[in-house]
C-alpha cells in the first residue's frame, strides 16, 4: 500500500472544536484491514483503536492475527493486549475503554482510526448499547454446566421458546450469546430482544466515516485458507499448548475463540490435526460470511475493493472527512 503525503492536514485542527471524528476501517476477516489502516494512520499521523473482541487478550497472538510488532512500532495501537485470557470482556467494556481512548486522543488533536471486524463492538461505539441486567456468575456457571452435560442445543431450544426473535439472530452453537440471552430472560423477566428494541437508536457522540473492504468470495476464501496455514507455520498450535500449560482452562471464553477451540480439541486427543485445520478453515469462512451479512445492513458504509485500485479514492475521502468542519 502506498499513499502520498497529505496536504492541508493543518485544517484538521478546526475539527477538534466539534465532535471527535473517527475513520472506521471494517470488513470480513482476511480482507486486508490491518495493512490499510496502518498505512492510513501513518500517513495522517494518527493512532489506531482495535475493535476486535479477541485481540484484547495477552497471549492470543498468532490465531487472532494481531498487528505485527513492526506495525505497532510504526503506529500506536490501543485496546490490544489489555487483558489476561481468563478475564471477561464485552461490547459494553469495549465501548467504555474506547470512549476513554477517543477522548484522550481528541484532546491531543490526534486523528483517530478504528479497525475491526466485530460488528457489535462497532455498532455499540456508534449508537450505544442497551442496558440489560448485570450478569449473575452463579446462574451462568449452572448454564455452562448444563451445556457441557446435555449440549448447547438444549439451551438454544429453550431460547427459541422464550425469545424466538433473539434466537433467529444467534447461531445455534454460539453458547456465550445464548447464555447471555437466557440470563437476561431469567433476571429481568423480559426477553433480550425487548431491551434491544426499547434501546432503539440515538445520536452518535462521534462523527464517523465507515470504509468497508470487499473481495470476491473465491478470493476471500483463498486468503482465509492461506492465512490459516501461515498461522500454523507461525506456531499457533504451540501458542495454545503454552496457554494450557500455564493453567488457562479450555472452557474459558477466550479459548473458545475462532480456531482456538479446535486446536484445544486436537491437543486433548479428540480430533487429529488435519481435522482441526479443516474445521478452522470451515468456521472462518462461515464467520466471514456472517460478518459480510452484518455489514451489508449498514447503509453508512462506503465500500471499496481491497486492492490498490481503491487506495487513492480512500485516501481522498479520508482527507475530505478530516478537513470538513
Residue ranges of model-derived segments:
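Phosphate/pyrophosphate-binding catalytic cores of soluble transferases and nucleic-acid-acting enzymes
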Residues: 3, 13-325
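Intrinsically disordered, low-complexity proline-rich regions
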Residues: 4-8
Amino acid at each position: 500500500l502506498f499513499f502520498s503525503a497529505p496536504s492541508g492536514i493543518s485544517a484538521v485542527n478546526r475539527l477538534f472544536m466539534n465532535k471527535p471524528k473517527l475513520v472506521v476501517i471494517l470488513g470480513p476477516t482476511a480482507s486486508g484491514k490491518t495493512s490499510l489502516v496502518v498505512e492510513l494512520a501513518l500517513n495522517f499521523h494518527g493512532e489506531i483503536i482495535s475493535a476486535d473482541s479477541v485481540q484484547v487478550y495477552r497471549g492470543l497472538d498468532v490465531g487472532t492475527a494481531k498487528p505485527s510488532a513492526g506495525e505497532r512500532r510504526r503506529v500506536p495501537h490501543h485496546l490490544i493486549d489489555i487483558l489476561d485470557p481468563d478475564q471477561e470482556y464485552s461490547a459494553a467494556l469495549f465501548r467504555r475503554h474506547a470512549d476513554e481512548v477517543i477522548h484522550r486522543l481528541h484532546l491531543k488533536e490526534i486523528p483517530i482510526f478504528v479497525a475491526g471486524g466485530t460488528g457489535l463492538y462497532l455498532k455499540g461505539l456508534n449508537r450505544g448499547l442497551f442496558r440489560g441486567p448485570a450478569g449473575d456468575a452463579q446462574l451462568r456457571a449452572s448454564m455452562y454446566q448444563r451445556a457441557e452435560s446435555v449440549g448447547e442445543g438444549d439451551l438454544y431450544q429453550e431460547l427459541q421458546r422464550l425469545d424466538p426473535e433473539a434466537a433467529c439472530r444467534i447461531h445455534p452453537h454460539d453458547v456465550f450469546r445464548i447464555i447471555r440471552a437466557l440470563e437476561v430472560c431469567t433476571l429481568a423477566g423480559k426477553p433480550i430482544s425487548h431491551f434491544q428494541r426499547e434501546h432503539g437508536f440515538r445520536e452518535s457522540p462521534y462523527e464517523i466515516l465507515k470504509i468497508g473492504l470487499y473481495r470476491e468470495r473465491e478470493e476471500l476464501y483463498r486468503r482465509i485458507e492461506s492465512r490459516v496455514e501461515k498461522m500454523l507455520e507461525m506456531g499457533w498450535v504451540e501458542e495454545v499448548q503454552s496457554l494450557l500449560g500455564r493453567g488457562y482452562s479450555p472452557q474459558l471464553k477466550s479459548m473458545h475463540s475462532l480456531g482456538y477451540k479446535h486446536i484445544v480439541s486436537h491437543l486433548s486427543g479428540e480430533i487429529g490435526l488435519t481435522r482441526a485445520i479443516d474445521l478452522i478453515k470451515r468456521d472462518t469462512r462461515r464467520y466471514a460470511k456472517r460478518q459480510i451479512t452484518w455489514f451489508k445492513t449498514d447503509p453508512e458504509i462506503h465500500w471499496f475493493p481491497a486492492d490498490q485500485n481503491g487506495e487513492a479514492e480512500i485516501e481522498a475521502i479520508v482527507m475530505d472527512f478530516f478537513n470538513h468542519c
